[in-house]
Structures are given as structure tokens and as C-alpha cells.
Amino acid sequence: MDSVIQEAKRVIIKVGSSLVTNDGKGLDANAIQKWAAQIAQLRALGKEVVLVSSGAIVEGMQRLGFDKRPVGIHELQACAAVGQMGLAQIYETSFRQHDVRTAQILLTHADLADRERYLNARSTLFTLLRLGVVPIINENDTVVTDEIKFGDNDTLGALVANLIEADALIILTDQRGLFSADPRKDPNAVFIHEAKAGDLKLEAMAGGAGSSLGRGGMLTKILAAKRAAFSGAHTVIAWGREDNVLTRLAGGEAIGTQLTAQTAQLTARKQWMADHLQTAGAVVLDNGAVQKLTAEGKSLLPIGVTDVSGSFGRGDVITCIDQGGRAVARGISNYASSDARRIMRKPSADIAAILGFVEEPELIHRDNLVLL
């Protein structure tokens, strides 16, 4: 098995907190200098690199004198604000030794959910890469309330991969990769060298009840690989303390677990819809509508909707849910939630009589719908 990183031209590298900090006591300058040296070598090979790095909160705790991770959200946000200064400084210093310029970009999921801000972020990143800069991205923990949690930057890395249509996502962690079970508890645990991104068996393995892999954050990494595959990006999950792991991957060596993207690449517009972590509302579909969407590639008609939840407007992205509660698609609604409730279960020919107007015969047109 050859590494998919060797042929990749544009790579997202996600480095977790445990790899850039001294056991939770501030940033590890030596480790960060090693990352910078390896990334500089990747750039010398002609690769464009974007780095997604955690570590701001831990650095802020050190600077503000916290012995333990604060419980209060505002204390965490204060740590993130203070620590982000140190994170940016040490990366800039480390990359400068290799004559590489860096840029700091702080994002929230809301930035990528808004179409205009999404396109602006995309254009800025493309410009930075064209200018030879290594963008260093982190979640803007200072202003968010529900994204300060373990593993969230795995998702952010996948979103950035989709945003700029990267060829590969490297998730560096404190574990060797994926196992079929917890190797510390199960002597029969098998290391997974390669699998398909989006394989439901992997999700079940990592997220089952009592799964140590799930508690260790492996489920977020598996889901991140699935998300990155929307844009055709392959994912490698590897132990970050492996000597020269990045340069060896770039040289073709197979390290860690490789999750290959085997789904058709989405258009930029459909990538944006798929990357909505939170949607304005949802519609529940009957079995016939699910079949039409998933197997036949049809539009969603009002007659196939059995329930509407949330408050959304025309043009908002909503989730389509099957009778079992599973999200099967996302799409742009042609009708506000109040109107959708009135026309659900009704044939499209009745829309004008019910509402007094017709926007479209479909609730969601197939061109504005993406399967999950």
C-alpha cells in the first residue's frame, strides 16, 4: 500500500493539542519546530499545505496560571484568546527559520455555513497558497460556545479540505491509527491499514457503547474522513510522534491508517450544503420519497414529506430525515417552514390552491440537494 500523500498536491494537516503541548502545560516549542521543518520540506516538494492546529486553550491556561482546565465557558474562552497569541507567535518563529511565511485564520462553523463568508474564506485561502504562505487555522474558540470540545478540529480540518478542494487530509494524533478494538484491552485487536472513508462498519466500531475508541476521539476522525471524502480528499490517521511522519508519508511510505475517498466528488455548491453542521430545520420523508432521492436521484416533492420541524425560510439549507430518524440528505428549501407545513403530504398540483402562489413544484430541487 502506497501513501496517498505522495501524489497529493494540496494537503491539510491537523495537529492535536497533545502533540503541540507539554502534557497540558503550555506549548512544546521543540515539537512545533519539528512540524515546521517537515512542512517546509513538503513545500519544497511542491505541495501546498494548510495547517489546522489545536493548543490555544492549553497555552492560555499556562499563561493565566490555571492548574486545571476551567469549567466555565468564559474562562475557557479567555484562555483561548490569550493562548492564541502564543500559538501564532511560536508558529511564526518556527517557520521563519525555514524562510516560510505563515498566516493566522480563525474560523467558526458559522463562517462556513454562510455562503458569502464561505466563498470569502475560500478566496483568501487560495490567495495565501498562491503567495506561498502556510495558513494556520484554528477554531475561533473565543466566540463559540458549543464547539470547545475534544476532536472538533478533526471536523474543522475536513471542512477546510472541502473548502479548498484538498487532495488529502492528514490527522496526526496520539495513537498509531485505527484498530478493530482497543489494543490495550483486547489482544486480538487488529490494526487497520486501509479502509474506505465512510464505511459504516468503521463508525459502528468506533462509536459503540463502551467503545474506548469513541472516547478517545477516533469516531470524530472517522467522521472527518467521511466528510473530507465529499471533495475527493483521502485521509491518513497517524501517530504524530512517529519520526519524520510527514516527510515519510510524502515519500510514499505507508504509515498509520489510510481512509480512501471512493465517492464521486461533489460540486463546490453541494460541498457547501454537505458541510452544514447545523441546519435551519428538517423534514421527515416517507419511504417512497427516500427511495426517489437516494436511489433515483429525484427532487423532493411536498407529497413525500410527513413532518416539518424548525423554523426556516425560503433558501435555507434543511435536513431530510427518513422514518428511522437518519439524515439522508441536505438541500435548499424552496418554501419557508410555515408554507412547507401546509403543503406537506399534498401533490404539487395543489400548491397554488393551498398557498395562493407557487414558487416551485418541488420542495427541494435535485440540483440543490446532496445525499449524506
UniProtKB/Swiss-Prot annotation:
Cellular location(s): Cytoplasm
Domain PUA as annotated: residue spans: 280-358
SMART domains documented for this protein: PUA
Protein residues bound to ATP: 14, 173-174
Domain of life from the UniProt record: Bacteria
Principal subcellular localisation of the protein: cytoplasm
UniProt-listed Enzyme Commission number(s): 2.7.2.11
Keyword Amino-acid biosynthesis belongs to the record: yes
Molecular function as annotated in GO: ATP binding; glutamate 5-kinase activity; RNA binding
Pathway assigned to this chain's UniProt record: Amino-acid biosynthesis; L-proline biosynthesis; L-glutamate 5-semialdehyde from L-glutamate: step 1/2
GO cellular component, as recorded: cytosol
Binding site for substrate: 54, 141, 153
A Pfam family annotated for this UniProt entry: AA_kinase
Annotated catalysed reactions: L-glutamate + ATP = L-glutamyl 5-phosphate + ADP
Keyword vocabulary terms for this entry: Amino-acid biosynthesis, ATP-binding, Cytoplasm, Kinase, Nucleotide-binding, Proline biosynthesis, Transferase
Any single GO BP term: L-proline biosynthetic process
Biological role stated in the UniProt entry: Catalyzes the transfer of a phosphate group to glutamate to form L-glutamate 5-phosphate.
PANTHER family listed in its UniProt record: GLUTAMATE 5-KINASE, ISOPENTENYL PHOSPHATE KINASE
Family per record: Belongs to the glutamate 5-kinase family.
Name of this chain's protein: Glutamate 5-kinase
Organism whose genome encodes this protein: Janthinobacterium sp. (strain Marseille) (Minibacterium massiliensis)
UniProt lineage: Bacteria, Pseudomonadati, Pseudomonadota, Betaproteobacteria, Burkholderiales
